[in-house]
């Protein structure tokens, strides 16, 4: 995994063990997301995801350890070039009501028999939140995607 944290934008990537079409499908299909979202968690808790994968459509995700500790994220699809590029505007909120809106660009490029999945996310309100997404959110997502793809 490589990471560049310029200003309040992050750039991170991981080589995943599947074709771009397979990685795209696992990343964008709501039923598959429900599996990989909690694949490395001993007690998965709650995961609800609905996706309308079209420009202008939205993905709504709700997850957390219990009903009173739920995180939410609504992504609006701005650009879809399957299975190569996905651009969204993401608005997320924490259980205590804090919200944040960012722009996410994800690309899927065939490389070395797998797929280089690259993420550029911008619009973070603080360096600390950006760094959390680098160190935990995207790193964890890549780990879970890899676990799903190799199960």
Language-model features: where?
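Hydrophobic-ligand binding "helix-grip"
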Residues: 34-35, 42, 49-54, 60, ...
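Hydrophobic pocket/interface hotspot
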Residues: 23, 27, 33, 59, ...
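Hydrophobic ligand-binding cavity/cleft-lining segments
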Residues: 1-44
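A conserved amphipathic terminal alpha-helix motif
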Residues: 116, 123-151
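Short, hydrophobic/aromatic-enriched beta-strand segments in well-ordered soluble domains
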Residues: 14, 119-121
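Ser/Thr-centric signal marking residues that sit
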Residues: 28, 102, 115
């Amino acid at each position: 995994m490589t990471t560049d944290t310029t200003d309040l934008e992050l750039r991170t990537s991981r080589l995943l063990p599947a074709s771009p079409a397979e990685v795209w499908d696992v990343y964008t299909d709501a039923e598959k997301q429900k599996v990989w979202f909690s694949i490395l968690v001993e007690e998965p808790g709650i995961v609800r995801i609905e996706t309308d994968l079209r420009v202008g459509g939205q993905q709504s995700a709700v997850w957390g350890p219990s009903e009173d500790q739920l995180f939410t994220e609504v992504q609006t699809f701005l650009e879809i070039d399957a299975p190569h590029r996905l651009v969204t505007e993401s608005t997320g909120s924490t259980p205590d009501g804090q919200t944040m809106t960012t722009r996410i660009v994800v690309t899927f490029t065939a490389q070395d028999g797998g797929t280089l999945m690259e993420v550029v996310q911008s619009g973070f309100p603080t360096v600390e939140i950006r760094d959390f997404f680098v160190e935990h959110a995207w790193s964890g997502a890549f780990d879970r995607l890899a676990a799903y793809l190799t199960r």
